[in-house]
Structures are given as C-alpha cells and as structure tokens.
C-alpha cells in the first residue's frame, strides 16, 4: 500500500513508538541481567588465598620456627602457607580437646544438647589430674559453663564430664572422636582419651591434622571464638558444701599479646612438650598456626606469632569476580 502524505507522519510516529518500546524493553532486560549478575556474583566468587610473591610455592624455612613441627593454614580456603615437618606423628596433649569441642558443638547443632542443659560430674571426671577446674563429684554445671572450662582453662575434668554426658562413657565418646577425625581426612590421628592427659603412644596426631580439625571447629562453629577469646572469667562451683567462685584464666597468652588472636587451644605434657593451635584474624584473613613439641611455653607462643606474622605480611585474600569484569572479557 502507498501511504498518503497525510498518513506518513502518523506511520512514522507509530514506528518510532514501536522502536522506543523495543529499546525500553531491551534496557529493562539489560538492567535485570546486571542486577542478577551483581546479586549472584558472591555465590560464584571463589575465595583464593595467595602469597604476594612472584611464585606461590609454599614457604619452607627452618629459621622461621624453633618447633620441630609446625604449620600455618588460611582458614577460609584451607591453603597451607607454611609448613615444617607437618606430617610427623606427635602427642598433642590438651590440643586433643579441639576434637572434644567439635563433638560437643555437633551435638548442639543436632539439637540433642543445649547450652543450658545441666551436667553432673562423675567420680571418674573428678579424678582427672593435670589442668582442671576442680569439679566435685555430683557437682552440676551447665553445658555452656563446661565449654568455658574446657576452652579457657583446659579443664580435663570438664572434658570428661561432657564426654560422659553426651555418650554415656568417655570410651564411647573417644570412639566418636576417631570416627570424626577419619571423616575429616585426618589420616595420621588416633585418640585414646578426650582430654589429652594420656601419654599412651597410641594417642597421636600431626600439625597438619590439628590445623584441619581447628579449621573445622572455627569455620563450622564460629561461636567457639566467643569463648576462646575470653581472657578471664569466673564460674561458680555448686556443691553440697555450698557455692564458691572459681577464676578461669586463658592458657593461650597470645589472646593478650598478639593483635587479632581469638583462640584456640594450648597443650603440654612430658611427652608432648609444649603445643599450640592459635587462631588470629585481621581484616578478611583468618590464620591457624600450629606448633608441636616446643621446648618451653614461651617458644610455642613465639613460634606461633612468627608464623602468623609471616602469613599476614606475605598473603592476601581476594575474591575472583573476573566473570563480571570488562577486563576479563577483553582478556578472552
């Protein structure tokens, strides 16, 4: 059909309106795509932890720490930043309690245990030597109080009381500890008790396996850091003789002396010597430093601080968002 001169402007306006509408819908669709990409970017972003060096080879230096075994791990990705003889089996002493805490928080997570549940101390739990909070037989404490006793003061008696409460016996609890360790891929670990007091040669782990279980505890149950970062706190003993206050002081001195330290667990026996798994956070980086068999308690803290300093100075955490950057498209 041939349009008359009068109808041409009207037709043009109709075509223009359709073109404008098409452009409008294209703009809306593009805006939606951009919004969706922006929203889902974090879901697809990969946290990557890399040393700020020309190569990413793990540092190996006998000069960094005195301890015969040690490892430094980034918590979010599990990247090993530094290691020294990290797979030699050694006695962990009270660092054992990290696995005990994992099982406690597993029970809390499943709902079979609550923070305000009460636990009665048995004669066996009371009989524990070493580091303890001096629970009396028949003494009743809440789960939360006993968690504090374990993670702050390294109470062997509190650990056994919790083990018996959860599984009926320490032996059964230890069986679950070994199953949990196997599930985490801790290939060089075997537990004989729930507190690390034993000096049995069949109770062992490695620096690497300790880092693995430390990472499991703090990433799956970050609430533990609320307790492990406490420097001092009082609990109340409630016994037949009455009530009395008892002070807990954190065995991890890095809580006060190292910037960003938020826990985690110390350990020492005549066989294990002095051990430590320390967690520190700065900005978006969380590091786990493990040292085993240091000659004295000062060296374990010095070695852990040295590894943490190395990690925070040499490494950075970034998010891989290349999928949505123009530079990435140009590189392709």
Language-model regions: role of each:
Residues 25-44:
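Sec-dependent N-terminal signal peptides of Gram-positive bacterial secreted proteins and lipoproteins
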Residues 17, 43-208, 214-219:
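Active-site-adjacent loops and short helices of periplasmic peptidoglycan-processing enzymes
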Residues 186-190, 198-326:
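Domain-terminus/edge residues, biased toward the C-terminal soluble/receptor-binding domains
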Residues 22-23, 27, 326:
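Residue-level signal for protein termini and structural transition zones
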Residues 37-38, 112, 170, 235-236:
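A short hydrophobic/aromatic micro-motif that marks alpha-helical segments and, especially, helix-coil
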Residues 327-332:
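A short, hydrophobic C-terminal helix/tail in secreted or cell-surface proteins
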Residues 30, 66, 115, 249-250:
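A generic structural signal for well-ordered coil/turn residues at beta-strand boundaries
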Residues 1-20:
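Short, Lys/Arg-enriched N-terminal segments with co-localized hydrophobic residues
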């Amino acid at each position: 059909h041939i349009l008359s001169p009068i109808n041409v402007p009207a037709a043009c306006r109709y075509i223009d309106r359709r073109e404008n509408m098409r452009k409008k819908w294209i703009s809306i669709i593009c805006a939606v795509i951009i919004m969706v990409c922006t929203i889902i970017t974090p879901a697809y972003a990969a946290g990557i932890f890399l040393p700020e060096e020309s190569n990413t080879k793990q540092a190996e230096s006998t000069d960094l720490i005195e301890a015969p075994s040690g490892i430094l791990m980034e918590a979010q990705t599990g990247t090993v930043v530094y290691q020294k003889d990290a797979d030699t089996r050694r006695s962990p002493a009270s660092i054992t309690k990290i696995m005990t805490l994992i099982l406690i928080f597993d029970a809390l997570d499943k709902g079979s245990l609550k923070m305000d549940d009460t636990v009665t101390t048995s004669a066996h739990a009371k009989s524990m030597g070493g580091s303890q909070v001096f629970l009396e037989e028949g003494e009743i404490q809440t789960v939360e109080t006993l968690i504090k006793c374990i993670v702050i003061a390294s109470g062997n008696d509190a650990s056994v009381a919790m083990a018996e409460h959860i599984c009926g016996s320490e032996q059964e609890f230890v069986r679950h500890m070994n199953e949990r360790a196997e599930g985490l891929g801790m290939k060089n670990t075997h537990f004989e008790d729930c507190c690390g007091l034993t000096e049995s040669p069949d109770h062992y782990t490695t620096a690497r396996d300790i880092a693995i279980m430390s990472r499991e505890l703090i990433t799956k149950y970050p609430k533990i850091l609320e307790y492990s970062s406490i420097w001092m706190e009082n609990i109340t003993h409630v016994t037949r003789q009455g009530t009395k206050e008892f002070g807990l002081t954190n065995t991890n001195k890095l809580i006060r002396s190292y910037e960003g330290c938020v826990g985690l667990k110390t350990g020492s026996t005549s066989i294990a010597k002095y051990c430590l798994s320390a967690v520190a956070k700065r900005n978006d980086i969380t590091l786990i430093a493990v040292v085993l068999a240091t000659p004295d308690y000062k060296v374990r803290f010095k070695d852990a601080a040295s590894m943490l300093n190395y990690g925070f100075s040499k490494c950075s955490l970034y998010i891989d968002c290349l999928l949505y950057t123009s530079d990435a498209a140009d590189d392709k």
